[in-house]
Every structure is written in C-alpha cells, then in structure tokens.
Amino acid sequence: MLYDDTIAAIATPPGEGGIGIVRISGRDALKILERIFVPVRPGRWKPYQMRYGRVVDQNGAVVDEALAVFMRGPRSFTAEDTAEISVHGGPLVVERVLQQALAAGARAAAPGEFTMRAFLNGRIDLAQAEATLDIITARTTTALALAEAQLGGWLSQELHRIRDLLMDPLAYCTALVDFPEDEVDPQDIETPLTAAVQALDALVASAQHGIIYRQGARAALIGRPNAGKSSLLNALLRVDRAIVTPIPGTTRDTLEETASLGGVPVVLTDTAGIVESDDPVERLGVARSRQAVRLADLALLVVDVSLPVADDDREIVALTEEKRTILTLNKIDLIDADRSIIAARQREYEQIRGKAFDAMVTVSALTGQGLDELGATVARLLLGAPIAADGRLVTNARHRDALARAADHARDALTGFQQGVSPDLLAVDLTAAINAIGEVTGESVGEDLLHAIFSRFCIGK
C-alpha cells in the first residue's frame, strides 16, 4: 500500500447527526479541496482558518453548504497536508461529499490509515496510536483517563528511559567483545540493568489493573426466580433494560449489558432463575445461566432477604464454590434493613456454601440503597487495590506481553553478568530486551503487525 498518496474518508459516525465531516490527508489535499469547495469569499487559503462556502460536483452543481479548513503539514494529525469539510449530517449528503473528493483524486482510506500515517510520519509512536483507539472505545471515565495519559506520552517516555538504561550496558558488552582487554566498572553495567529490570517489572505488574480498566470484566447475577436479579441489573444500568414482573421466571434467557462499577467496565449477565423445570425453554435458560457463571470473573448471588433459604438455593450456591462471589442481599426495603434478619440470611447461606463469601452487600434495587457500595465491592474484588494516584498503568495485553519478555531478557542479562557470562551472550539478551520494548513503541515492528493493529480502527480515524 502507498503512503505518499492522498486519502479521504468520512470522519464522523454513520447515521444522522448535526454535522458530518469528510477528512482528506496527503500531498494533494489542498488541490482536492480547491476542486470541490468554493468559498463564498474568494482568496488564498490560510492554514487553520475556517471558511464558509459550498461543496460542488464536477459539473459545478452544489452538493451542500459547508465549512472547510486546511491544515499544513506537519502541523496536523497525520503530519501531512490535511483538509476537513463539515457539512450537514445526513448520511447521503456526507457520502456525496466523499465521492466528490474521490473523484477529484483522493483514494478511499483504509481503516485506521489516518492514525497509521501519524505514526509513520513520526507524530506519535505506536503506543500513542493505540491509545487513540482506546479513547474512542473507552467505556468508563477511568478507562478514558488512562487512555488520555497514554496518548499524552507517559508510557513512551518511560520506555525510552528504560531503553537508555539498557543501551549503556549493551555498548559496554559490545566494546568488551571487540576489546576484551579493556576494564569496565561492574557498576556501570549492574546498576542500570537493575534499574531497568525493576522498572519493567513495575510496568508489567500494573497491567493486572490496567487491562481490567480497559477491557472490563464479567459478572453473573444468579439466584432464585424473583430474587430481583433483573431489577438489580436495571438499577445498576440506570435504565429499564430487563423486563421485570412479579411473576417468577420472567427472565428465561441470559441478558448482557455493560455498566461502570467503581470505574471498571463490567459486563453484567442477568440469568434465568435456576430451578428444576420440565419446560424445555426454561431448562435451556437454566443451562445458559450455568454457562454464564462459568465464564464470569465474579458472581453476584442475588437473594431476596425477606425469604428463608429454600431447597433450590443449595444447587445455586454450589455454582459459586470455585468463583469469587458477593452475597447480594436484595429487597432490604421489605425488612426495614433489620440487622438480625440480615445476619441470619448471611449465616444460612454461608452454612450451605460451607465457607464465607468473598463479600456481603445489602441492597434495594427498588430504592437504590446500597448500589454504590455494591459497585465499589465489585471493583475491589476485581482489582484487589485502588488505582494508582497518577493513573500510570499498562492497559494493553500486547504491551504487557512484550514488556514481560523485555523484563525476562533484561533479568537474564543481569543474572548472566553477575555469574560471569561472556559479553557476547549478554549482548544477545540486551538486544532482545530492547527489541521487545520497540514492539510497544513501534521501533521494531513489521508491516503485518501494523496492519493488524490499525485494522481495528474505524475508517476515517
């Protein structure tokens, strides 16, 4: 694929909206803009100034009123000459404007090609490019803050610092291969290597939280029919997503929606009440409920606190034996939050389970009481600790894996040096560590990987 031609794409989401934007980037961006856009006030284009006019077709017929701006490279997103045309947000209008740009000499952009050009032109590195996608797909304010911090360059700066720590020992090892008679202070190799290993280990450890914030987790709501699972789902989502009736068994299939709980995007699965049934549809729903529990990172055992334990509860509780589980005592509004009843229910269910639950929370899906505590408890069990104050977490599994390999190679080099391994073998590990870091920043990646990464972007980004 060429990267020195001019591309165009619709940069706004499909469908109707207030405006639609067509983006053009490449060496002929201004020429194409001048062919299809006629400003009301003629004159030379001044970069970064919005102009009002009309988009016209090849015959001069007006396509739509528009606002257009031209940005001179490298002071643009792609670091190339770029034009953006804003028109009315009807899908037909926006598509017609795009077709005029293509007819005037632009090529239809591939998914993520604008961001790829920003990377290839050195405006951002690969970690920052991937952060752009994370900003678009962020489902919680915490995930958004982490993505914005990565786009701001903290990870790139830290990796360049670590790379520099590895480069000096590599230079010493290379010199010792060529000039073995030279003497090197051991601290000149051991000190930066130790610092690099510690820094890489810290980044890898941060991914345990960061990936959850970015990708989310899964939680299954399980319990008897009419325990209030669907009502609780609706309350956590703050919308009426699941059908709720007083009739037990209303939910006969699993239903999934994503909620932000304690800053963590959690896919909540509302399951059918687990009971013995001769109804084939209900039995299928129960089977899917069991599957949902198996796939979940966490289970919420939803209990109607006003009712005593029943025989059906034993089978339900058994599903939680190998799963982190929150005993969620619902409908506390029916018992006026009577502590003696709450304690009795907790004791009864723990006796059935044979051990304590990972947490117990009292809630009322009807009044909203306890929902914030439930969300915080879910986040605590998933994360184990609150987010770092500076928000500097590795959030991408690809980055974590590459940095883990870098840490292993750097550690092997450090251990090898302490054990007197020859400099040429140390250089192999140091080079491998530096290359693994380059897989994150983009300094040592192939074209296939780049296409795999950028193909996940939408067209126009």
Curated annotation (Swiss-Prot):
Residues 216-383 form the TrmE-type G domain. Transmembrane segments: none annotated. It comes from the Bacteria. (6S)-5-formyl-5,6,7,8-tetrahydrofolate binds at R23, E84, R123, K461. Its EC number is 3.6.-.-. Binds 1 potassium ion per subunit. Pfam families: MMR_HSR1 (PF01926), MnmE_helical (PF12631), TrmE_N (PF10396). One of its GO terms (biological process) is tRNA methylation. The keyword Cytoplasm applies. One of its GO terms (molecular function) is metal ion binding. It is found in: Cytoplasm. K(+) binds at N226, T245, I247, T250. InterPro entries: G_TrmE, GTP-bd, GTP-bd_TrmE_N, GTPase_MnmE, MnmE_dom2, MnmE_helical, P-loop_NTPase, Small_GTP-bd. Keywords: Cytoplasm, GTP-binding, Hydrolase, Magnesium, Metal-binding, Nucleotide-binding, Potassium, tRNA processing. GO terms for cellular component: cytosol. Its cofactor is K(+). Mg(2+) binds at S230, T251. Exhibits a very high intrinsic GTPase hydrolysis rate. Involved in the addition of a carboxymethylaminomethyl (cmnm) group at the wobble position (U34) of certain tRNAs, forming tRNA-cmnm(5)s(2)U34. Homodimer. Heterotetramer of two MnmE and two MnmG subunits. Belongs to the TRAFAC class TrmE-Era-EngA-EngB-Septin-like GTPase superfamily. TrmE GTPase family. This is tRNA modification GTPase MnmE. It comes from Roseiflexus sp. (strain RS-1). The lineage of its organism: Bacteria, Bacillati, Chloroflexota, Chloroflexia, Chloroflexales.
